Amino acid sequence: MSGKGKAGKSGGKAGSETKSMSRSSKAGLQFPVGRVHRLLKKGNYAQRVGAGAPVYMAAVLEYLAAEILELAGNAARDNKKQRIVPRHLQLAIRNDEELHKLLGNVVISQGGVVPHIAPELLPSKSSKGKKDEGVSQEL
């Protein structure tokens, strides 16, 4: 054995104390990489799960959650509310084209419906300010 090799599994001295670091903190994520890895293995999606797959999946889940929460927070603020409720999630998802496409078949309990009035039912803007000086409607 040469003297230039690593001493032990950690690569440092045998007696040194190193603080363990989670895979989530190594990747700079808030979502749990270890839990995602465990669920990927337990779900029988594939025979083997690579080391990078749970990190990538946790990052994608964290991004989607942040995107939905930001839009829902904006919807809550527009309604002058401090707390995000399912209605705000529904409005956020249905008003965003890409999220609506992704979650099109998802039903959000207590979400309600997105308000929409057909353009044909709205009052026409052309008749505003003009008076009919043509033939009278009286018989």
Curated annotation (Swiss-Prot):
Residues modified to N6-acetyllysine: K9, K13
Gene Ontology cellular-component annotations: nucleosome; nucleus
Matching InterPro entries: Histone-fold, Histone_H2A, Histone_H2A/H2B/H3, Histone_H2A_C, Histone_H2A_CS
Segments for region (Disordered): 1-27, 119-139
Biased composition (Polar residues): 17-27
Single Gene Ontology MF annotation: structural constituent of chromatin
Biased composition (Basic and acidic residues): 129-139
Pfam family, one: Histone_H2A_C
Top-level taxon of the source organism: Eukaryota
Phosphoserine modifications at: S136
Keywords assigned: Acetylation, Chromosome, DNA damage, DNA repair, DNA-binding, Methylation, Nucleosome core, Nucleus, Phosphoprotein
Description of post-translational modifications: Phosphorylated to form H2AS128ph (gamma-H2A) in response to DNA double-strand breaks (DSBs) generated by exogenous genotoxic agents and by stalled replication forks. Phosphorylation is dependent on the DNA damage checkpoint kinases MEC1/ATR and TEL1/ATM, spreads on either side of a detected DSB site and may mark the surrounding chromatin for recruitment of proteins required for DNA damage signaling and repair. Gamma-H2A is removed from the DNA prior to the strand invasion-primer extension step of the repair process and subsequently dephosphorylated. Acetylated by ESA1 to form H2AK4ac and H2AK7ac.
One BP annotation, GO: DNA repair
Modified residues (N5-methylglutamine): Q110
Residue(s) carrying N-acetylserine: S2
Subcellular localization: Nucleus; Chromosome
Chief location category: nucleus
Membrane-spanning segments: none
Motif [ST]-Q motif mapped to chain: 136-137
Similarity comment text for this entry: Belongs to the histone H2A family.
Misc: In contrast to vertebrates and insects, its C-terminus is not monoubiquitinated.
Subunit note: The nucleosome is a histone octamer containing two molecules each of H2A, H2B, H3 and H4 assembled in one H3-H4 heterotetramer and two H2A-H2B heterodimers. The octamer wraps approximately 147 bp of DNA.
Summary of the function given for this chain in its UniProt record: Core component of nucleosome which plays a central role in DNA double strand break (DSB) repair. Nucleosomes wrap and compact DNA into chromatin, limiting DNA accessibility to the cellular machineries which require DNA as a template. Histones thereby play a central role in transcription regulation, DNA repair, DNA replication and chromosomal stability. DNA accessibility is regulated via a complex set of post-translational modifications of histones, also called histone code, and nucleosome remodeling.
Protein name: Histone H2A
